[in-house]
């Protein structure tokens, strides 16, 4: 019977840790971008899970305008047919859109464009999350 050496044990622990991290990482994906408009923080993010996705744009001051435009892609797990859905919204301080995959479908990707305009300045960013 083979003995487990200290070096082999370390390799085994490393492989198991990486496998666990990759498995957990596949369950949710998040991408966020951060900037500033007139000294206040602007953040845009996209999040995706197996059957849902969401995107948001936030601004640290309740003035000006903010928006998020998102396209969500999904695939039918039986027919492999693909589909997309698009949503847009705009307001002050914080905006949010969410999507749910249709029956027998799972998420593929969400792409979002974020925009904050205030005090004569504009911040834009794109975010993509993939399942």
Language model features: what each stretch is:
Residues 31-131:
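Post-signal peptide N-terminal regions of Sec-secreted extracellular proteins
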